[in-house]
Design a protein with these regions (language model features):
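Short glycine/proline-centered loop/turn elements that form peptide/ligand docking sites
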Residues: 83-87, 179-189, 203, 207, ...
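C-terminal hydrophobic helical "lid"/dimerization subdomain
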Residues: 2-4, 286-341
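Glycine-rich phosphate-binding loop and adjacent beta-alpha segment
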Residues: 229-305, 339-341
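Short, glycine/polar-rich helix-capping loops at beta-to-alpha or helix-loop-helix junctions
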Residues: 101-102, 182-192, 260-267
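NAD(P)H dinucleotide-binding glycine-rich loop of Rossmann-like/cofactor-binding domains
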Residues: 72-79, 87-157, 304
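Short amphipathic alpha-helix with an adjacent loop that forms part of the alpha/beta core around
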Residues: 206-217
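Glycine-rich beta-strand-centered segment in the early N-terminal region that forms part
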Residues: 30-48, 56-100
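Mid-domain Rossmann-like dinucleotide-binding core that forms the NAD(H)/NADP(H) cofactor-binding site
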Residues: 127-205
Length: 341
């Protein structure tokens, strides 16, 4: 095929606090030649997720930091436009970890590149409810949360990509599910559309009182994604034997020095009877991904699990859109449309 140009966004400098435009740079380069066993993927949708903020920092973490001048990492969905692989044909739809760019050359042996079917569910959902956020919810609750029917589950960031799925799976498992979200619109969506039993607005004047009213039997499982004041309120109402899977704590991600932040580990550790808690990674359960993928896709296709997307357009504006994750401007899964087919 004729030589094409590829636009990408790289990390230009490490953010101090909230990332700004100058921390990123748009670059244009030639697309590498596709070699035997490789495919060229045209990226159609880009997923923006909170974990990316941690990768921008040089601080020690569960994953290596993004190098300066390296393409920002991300899960994406696209279509194969050139193939020198016996496993992929032109026109195949795939998910991959291309990062913030328009085209990606993938090796056929890359386990993070795999076929998906946009006839079953919309292609963009493979980046959300049927993708990494959905799998995080599935394993975070079923494996880390160890749910028992009749227990009370509290879900932070309940209208978000992960939390919304956690709560809906919780209802399937017979739990009393209470969400925590920001604002009346999101709370109404969580309760009326997603089917949570209750939803507490974390902006409420009396968060402790509102949470206690929603959880009259105390809290058995807390799915942690936020940290801060929300976690402080939840921690006062744990039952003995409670579990708290920690997916993240977005309230601290833009701190100038996260080592000085009061994290869920500090809050839980100070309790007389701390809940069972740990930071988990979805890749801890990689061997079971097929199980989660099958279940989530079927539930979405059958209308048993609902989802919300904020769909925006333009690779060049990805840094701006990324900031929405921390201001609450997005509603549900934040996806950037990169190109038409």
């Amino acid at each position: 095929m004729p030589e094409q140009q590829n636009k990408s966004i790289v990390l230009a400098s490490r953010p101090i606090g909230e990332p700004i435009a100058d921390n990123f740079r748009l670059e244009t380069t030639s697309i590498p030649e596709v070699k035997d066993g490789q495919v060229l993927i045209k990226i159609l949708y880009l997923s923006l997720d909170p974990y990316m903020r941690g990768r921008m920092s040089a601080a020690k973490s569960y994953a290596e930091p993004v190098a300066i001048d390296e393409v920002m990492p991300a899960e994406t969905a696209g279509v194969v436009v050139e193939s020198k692989s016996s496993q992929y044909a032109v026109g195949d739809y795939v998910c991959c970890r291309s990062g913030w760019q328009e085209y990606f050359v993938s090796n056929q042996k890359d386990p993070m590149t795999y076929k998906v079917d946009p006839e079953t569910v919309p292609l963009s959902t493979y980046l959300g409810v049927c993708g990494m956020p959905g799998r995080t919810a599935y394993f975070g609750l079923k494996r880390e949360g160890k749910p028992v029917a009749g227990e009370t589950l509290v879900v932070s960031a309940a209208s978000g990509a992960v939390g919304s799925v956690v709560g809906q799976i919780g209802k399937k498992l017979g739990l009393h599910v209470v969400g925590i979200a920001g604002g009346s619109k999101k709370c109404a969506y969580v309760k009326d559309e997603l089917g949570f039993d209750e939803c507490v607005d974390y902006k409420a004047i009396d968060l402790d009182g509102a949470l206690k009213a929603a959880c009259p039997k105390g809290i058995d499982i807390y799915f942690e994604s936020v940290g801060g004041a929300v976690t402080e309120a939840v921690s006062k109402q744990f039952n003995p034997g409670a579990r708290a899977p920690i997916c993240g704590y977005i309230a601290s991600y833009n701190a100038t020095d996260i080592t000085k932040e009061r994290t869920p580990f500090h809050i839980f550790g100070e309790l007389e009877t701390p809940p069972e808690h740990k930071f988990f990674l979805v890749f801890d359960h990689y061997a079971e991904f097929a199980e989660a993928n099958s279940a989530l896709t079927k539930w979405v296709a059958d209308g048993e699990i609902k989802y919300q997307e904020t769909m925006v357009e333009g690779l060049e504006r990805a840094p701006e859109y990324f900031s929405w994750l921390f201001s609450g401007k997005n509603f549900g899964k934040l996806v950037v449309k990169i190109a038409d087919e």
